[in-house]
Amino acid sequence: MKDTYESPLNSRYASDRMKYIFSPDFKFRTWRRLWIALAESEKELGLNITDEQIAELKAHKDDINYDVAAAREKEVRHDVMSHVYAYGVQCPNAKPIIHLGATSCYVGDNTDVIIMREAMLLIRKELVNLLNVLAKFAVEYKDMPCLAFTHFQPAQPTTVGKRAALWLNEFLMDFQNLEFQLSQLKLLGSKGTTGTQASFMELFDNNTDKVKALDKMIAEKMGFDSCFAVSGQTYSRKLDYQMLTVLCGIAMSATKFSNDIRLLQHMKEIEEPFEKHQIGSSAMAYKRNPMRSERIASLSRYIIADIQNTAMTSGAQWFERTLDDSANKRLSVPEAFLAADAVLDLCINVADGLVVYPKMIEKHLLEELPFMATENIMMEAVKRGGDRQELHEKIRVHSMDAGRVVKVEGGKNDLLDRIAADSALGVTREELEGIMKPENFVGRAPQQTQEFVDNEIQPILDKYSDLLGLDVEIKV
């Protein structure tokens, strides 16, 4: 059916892997895992819950009766209680102890944390694969001189690989932030309606040790080290913001990467992959548009804007909780992850298929190199007895005249011919050609690139070698 809206993130951009993490199946199966963890922990701490009841809960943890839950929600207008009811229909013996002592946020918020963790683990996998692809490209082209740009004006040469190392460094910073945020991630735990654990104190006859143990046991059963020490009814919505700082950072890095590729493609130096039957324009048949890089920039802009939702939502929470977070959070958090997933898959695809045109790179570099070589030329002339100030003025005049030929007349850069013809400078054309070797102007760019990959990137690739080899698919 095509008669209703569907999110492009779902239909066009995000991977099936990420879409599953934010699917109803993953969400409601996690609810049931949390109810099982709660019941098991309460039993282990002495409540009257039987092995048979827990076995019944486990037997139906994955076969969710959505129709029963949906019908119940129409009646009671409460999603959690509707699923408690539906689970109880399948588990009549365990029905009395489902959700015992808990509030809605026990399943809602803990599940949100679990979903974000799973989604962030996938983001980490994608990011590691991107680091790997970009590192290979950087090392392969670390020695190839190219024109650098500041203010998008020609500047001191760098190398193709060193420029890629700049992209790599941006994504490395995102990886480091991701690792930190994952290391700090905690569950809400079992905190009750206002975060005081009052209902659990009642259940356990005011036994503080058991109530504290309940939190820890649930965390461990769900694969976490700990729960938040204090909270209201919900975990602090600042957590959503902190997680999205990782995605926003990735979007910032991807924007720079994709914009650089778009500019390089305009100059015909480097292109993103272009499929054999791909069409660039419906009117201009010759066009090879950088549509993947443009999509990266477009989706990244969405993520950068989306993080404002989590910032405003966090600040707007009243006292122990308010519900104006809910609708916004249901949109902003999943869509940020879906968009970041799409961005990273696109970045991997583009970086892995970059097409380099060495002759065009050399052409552009040699067109500008005479201007950049003037200081070296002047130093050579000074060593032969010339006056630095007089030489500077002569080279300045020659540079202005050569620039005029290029810009006004559309001619070739004849600066070297002018310098060679000036007897006051005393440098021959052959000597100028020796000075004009591009590799003499790139400084430590090749060494910087290799050292950066060896010292900063390779340890990550070694640590997470089991994550490499991700197969990404670009749908359109």
Residues covered by each model-derived region:
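Glycine-rich cofactor-pocket loops
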Residues: 139-161, 271-287, 320-327, 352-372
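Short, well-ordered beta-strand elements within core beta-sheets of diverse protein domains
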Residues: 162, 241-249, 376-384
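Glycine-rich anion/phosphate-binding loop at the beta-strand->alpha-helix junction
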Residues: 174, 225, 232-326, 330
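Short beta-alpha connecting loops at secondary-structure transitions
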Residues: 19-23, 68-70, 278-298, 320-335, ...
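Long, amphipathic alpha-helical stalk/connector segments used for oligomerization, subunit docking
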Residues: 302-388, 394
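A helix-coil-helix interface module used to build multimeric assemblies
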Residues: 1-198, 206-219, 280-281, 291-295, ...
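Active/binding-pocket-proximal capping segment
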Residues: 271, 394-401
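Amphipathic alpha-helices that form helix-helix packing interfaces
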Residues: 38-41, 123, 127-130, 134-137, ...
